Amino acid sequence: MTHGEELGSDVHQDSIVLTYLEGLLMHQAAGGSGTAINKKSAGHKEEDQNFNLSGSAFPSCQSNGPTVSTQTYQGSGMLHLKKARLLQSSEDWNAAKRKRLSDSIVNLNVKKEALLAGMVDSVPKGKQDSTLLASLLQSFSSRLQTVALSQQIRQSLKEQGYALSHESLKVEKDLRCYGVASSHLKTLLKKSKTKDQKSGPTLPDVTPNLIRDSFVESSHPAVGQSGTKVMSEPLSCAARLQAVASMVEKRASPAASPKPSVACSQLALLLSSEAHLQQYSREHALKTQNAHQVASERLAAMARLQENGQKDVGSSQLSKGVSGHLNGQARALPASKLVANKNNAATFQSPMGVVPSSPKNTSYKNSLERNNLKQAANNSLLLHLLKSQTIPTPMNGHSQNERASSFESSTPTTIDEYSDNNPSFTDDSSGDESSYSNCVPIDLSCKHRIEKPEAERPVSLENLTQSLLNTWDPKIPGVDIKEDQDTSTNSKLNSHQKVTLLQLLLGHKSEETVERNASPQDIHSDGTKFSPQNYTRTSVIESPSTNRTTPVSTPPLYTASQAESPINLSQHSLVIKWNSPPYACSTPASKLTNTAPSHLMDLTKGKESQAEKPAPSEGAQNSATFSASKLLQNLAQCGLQSSGPGEEQRPCKQLLSGNPDKPLGLIDRLNSPLLSNKTNAAEESKAFSSQPAGPEPGLPGCEIENLLERRTVLQLLLGNSSKGKNEKKEKTPARDEAPQEHSERAANEQILMVKIKSEPCDDFQTHNTNLPLNHDAKSAPFLGVTPAIHRSTAALPVSEDFKSEPASPQDFSFSKNGLLSRLLRQNQESYPADEQDKSHRNSELPTLESKNICMVPKKRKLYTEPLENPFKKMKNTAVDTANHHSGPEVLYGSLLHQEELKFSRNELDYKYPAGHSSASDGDHRSWARESKSFNVLKQLLLSENCVRDLSPHRSDSVPDTKKKGHKNNAPGSKPEFGISSLNGLMYSSPQPGSCVTDHRTFSYPGMVKTPLSPPFPEHLGCVGSRPEPGLLNGCSVPGEKGPIKWVIADMDKNEYEKDSPRLTKTNPILYYMLQKGGGNSVTTQETQDKDIWREPASAESLSQVTVKEELLPAAETKASFFNLRSPYNSHMGNNASRPHSTNGEVYGLLGNALTIKKESE
């Protein structure tokens, strides 16, 4: 067996197998320290090497492993003794395997085959294990290094040569009899000397320098390190095989101490995770250090600057940032914050006030801080923050550094800094922090201003300083590094959450960072929509005009107002404009952007919820995920109290207009760093101009501080999921409180829907979205789904059953086509006219009832409905055409039902667009599963609230997509207040993206105008035949759109979903959380329906969602924008459900978007 030959695929396979076997043996040992693992692996590798060198490597391996242990025992006696024990335990465990391996000792390849067949039968692909083991060996090689031992082994091997391999086998057999570690070590020393002498020359032949270096470096590191090196070599494969065989034999041997194997298994587990975590740890360690440095500096500088720099925020803080380099960054950050605060006042007076000071602080402080703060602050702040955030530091540090660097680079120079952002988090961190603080302090000051203008700032700033000291780290990165903000806030505010929620969130955010990259706008919309939800959500709906105007000039503000549908519309274009470039600039920027919106959203959410229920927010913060759901419910209730009546919210809209601007301004500021300081200044000025009205009518400064703190904590605890939940739950109680309003609004919305129908793009697109969702499951079933939806009004339980029935999106299409289709057909046949009447009635009076009762079934029914034959759906649609409510109700039940269903459908579309296309749905789902596996921490974080929904949605992808359809519709419904304007912006903007459903308005021209509808000509004909049920026609169009939308609508719907999350700001997360939980799906449905009710313009919402859907193609054209939306969708509840239930789109589409985004970056 020539080692050179083994260097090829065989060597690689062998190394993989050996790695797997080593890991298997280690785990079989049921224990062992990391040292033990390395001992095992090192022993295995060394033994394998010896085995390669000597035909009978098992004895040699066994003795070699112990020999290494014995020789290393000379160097590190305990380690080698443990290694010997570990090898013995491996003998005990794998005596039979070792015998089998020893049978194939002569033929290393045969032996390798035996190992593969026997020990590695289940792991032919040991690449992962081998990589992990290699990383483990590498990580522990330094620990195990015994240069003298390795040299001795090599010398002995060279001296004795290969002849002792068989003797070593005998000796190893004798060692089995020895049973004593000492005798084993002695005999193994002799054997290993002989083996090493034998394998030494062979190893030098193959890789004399490599093996010698490995052995010289450390006998067992040589075993582990050279094993690692040899892992890529045939020698390592054979030696490792022998070592594995010896491990098996030794585990079977009597004198085995399980502890080493336990340590090895533990190390294997730790290092396997460590292999992944080390990347994060190494990357995030620097990032965390930088982030913590900046955060500590910020906290310190915030305290100083808030006290000292409040009066001289713009100039003195600039000078402070310039003068104090180490403090300069902290100061620059708080100075930027204070400057932002002052500039908030100045922004009210002169928008440019913020821009000049903020850019100055950003650029100048970036240079100074990067030069000085980095070094000094990196040490002290890093140590301090690392100490404070020891557990979450690797993950949180990564996110925080990422955010800090992203923000730093994004604020001074969105593109350049973004470019520097990833490569130099430490360097960018300080600058990022300063520019970051520029925007975020503005945010904080904006919130303060909203609550208290300049007069209150000192108190609010002091309180805010205290709160920021607790929450500033996340808040400062909150602008661009909201994700890290959440993490940082979690780590700082919630140490226990740091370990659990922070790590999960960091893992969750790590993958969601990409998702959020595409979803910061949605997050912003979520945040804006959520935080104003008490007073601003309606306001945002009303302020869409203001926000719409502001977003144009200030994309961040626009993104902020994006929470509301109207802003969303403009935001799509603007987000594409400015979010896309920052995202294109760098993924960290996108992550930061996503983080910032989510952070703001969380902050606004926390503020909103804290205004209503500060204690619940605190509880949610403490209770992390579980509390997140309950807290979100509490927050939803609080939001209900504040924004319970959707109609009330509308009247409040104008009053809240300032408030929405305030959250928008905050969001804008947070996002503005992504754009630029100028944009930030403009947004700030706009936000400030809008915010002064908001803060005074809003909460007092201290209250806002508390709310901000709690919001930050909530954000950290719940992440965006809790945001969605909070808003969604808020909206759910709000809908409950204002069901009559919703019913009235439903009538109004029906009118609005008709209006939007006049806009072919929106309703048509929304319906197309819904239909493509269903169409993805099955175009024909979706056509039947319209009747199914129609029936869902009549047969709500059936829809529930349908929803639960579809286990998987694919199964959904088939199973629904079969059983569900039959049930729906039966229901359709039995309830065609009744459903129309019932739908109409539900839309009128039963609307609330339908909302509450049928809401979930409808939503589920919508899930099921796609299974319905398109013909049946066409039939139902045609039947419903006569009745406007009935028409939409076929798809949605009554219009109110329709709203519910829309909301649910928005949910479904929201989720389903991700799993929108059947083919891409599977792919996306597979991607979602991959990302799910990849995002274990995220899933762990989301598992409680979201996994429940995700698993049903994953299993019931079509129901999920239907939910998403509902969700998407609901998000559209949600921003109903501003949905028409949003639709105007949205579908006009997305029209270029997807002309088919561009104007998928409730106007039947939209139905006629169905570039996507051609996939369902008959369905389109059905739609055309019933132009009155614009929603239904829209849905039919989505079905027709489905085939096209799978191509375009997939992205389109992804964006649409993203928009839906924006529309349903936090509702998507709530959907995500609720849909993740099977029991929550009803709540989700209710909340979705309530969202629809809350924003009765369900048709509008559909239109808006459709427009967003339409925008998706445009977003595809604008990859970064789409990426924004796509990650945002993933990030939002829909993001959560989407990476899981609609991962296909979120990840398939999002993957494309992320790929595009990365490419753009």
From Swiss-Prot:
There is a cross-link at K111, K170, K195, K198, K374, K509, K757, K803, K851, K902, K932, K1108, K1118, K1157 (Glycyl lysine isopeptide (Lys-Gly) (interchain with G-Cter in SUMO2)). Keywords: Acetylation, Activator, Biological rhythms, Isopeptide bond, Nucleus, Phosphoprotein, Receptor, Repeat, Repressor, Transcription, Transcription regulation, Ubl conjugation. Residues 1121-1161 are annotated as: Repression domain 4. Residues 50-68, 517-552 have a biased composition (Polar residues). Residues 78-335 are annotated as: Repression domain 1. It is found in: Nucleus. It holds the Pfam family NRIP1_repr_2. The modification Phosphothreonine is found at T207. A motif (LXXLL motif 4) lies at residues 267-271. Residues 736-886 are annotated as: Repression domain 3. Changing N1067G: Reduces binding to RAR, RXR and RAR/RXR. Acetylation abolishes interaction with CTBP1. Phosphorylation enhances interaction with YWHAH. Acetylation regulates its nuclear translocation and corepressive activity. One of its GO terms (molecular function) is nuclear retinoid X receptor binding. Residues 34-68, 393-436, 517-559, 604-623, 639-702, 717-747, 829-848, 950-976 are annotated as: Disordered. Disruption phenotype: Mice are viable and morphologically normal, but smaller than wild-type and heterozygous littermates. Homozygous NRIP1-null mature female are defective in ovulation and completely infertile. Embryos with heterozygous NRIP1 loss show anomalies of the urinary tract including dysplastic kidneys with cystic dilations, severe hydoureter with hydronephrosis and ureterocele. A motif (LXXLL motif 9) lies at residues 937-941. A motif (LXXLL motif 2) lies at residues 133-137. Residues 724-747, 950-962 have a biased composition (Basic and acidic residues). A motif (LXXLL motif 6) lies at residues 501-505. Residues 1-416, 754-1161 are annotated as: Interaction with ZNF366. PANTHER family: NUCLEAR FACTOR RIP140, NUCLEAR RECEPTOR-INTERACTING PROTEIN 1. This is Nuclear receptor-interacting protein 1. It comes from Mus musculus. The lineage of its organism: Eukaryota, Metazoa, Chordata, Craniata, Vertebrata.
